[in-house]
């Protein structure tokens, strides 16, 4: 709020890596950052979005994902009408679902869109999807909210919906990028061709019996250096200088090996009627966007 020399800072990393640190609520400066006060929501831990009403600077909207490693109540959307002196939780979904993104409509600042994120982070595991991951809409600058995504209007609505990012062109046109954790359909396998998975548990004897031309075709298709042809690979395996599974390890990305999750990943949806209906805009898979989770 440059007009009034007010700066708001939401503390806490809102991405959900194991290394993400929690914050201490909302910080506020009324002198362009020279001094600061804590303006509440200390138990929110992770704040991702702050929206100031362009028509009334006393009205502020906060989106919080809540505690990272445990369930908590101070999450969702909070609104202040007194410049941060007090806060009202205007959207609470449950104690493991928070708000990861909020956008205001450029042509009508009373209309807001927010995305919720269901997740359960542990030091040894991360479930980052659920039915409660959805998009909500407000027409009164955050006083009330309505869920606008469901299984009937074209938007994914199931236990595999992960993090959702929003981009709002106007009150009618909204884009959403979704981390879809549903599995991709299995490709039809051509049995005559070798695949990297074939080498995951293959024995020394089995590898040595592979047809030389077939193995050469596999090595060429997977961009092995020319010095690694079928003969040299078989020699290395025969002398036990390498294991057959080393071919799989070499080809498989470390991240893919770690998670082994052939999921759909990123999808982009568009609504042209204010969120009443949605259409997926991409036909093919959008690769190289999310490598394990979209967090």
Predicted segments, located by residue:
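Beta-propeller blade termini and top-face loops
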Residues: 1-295
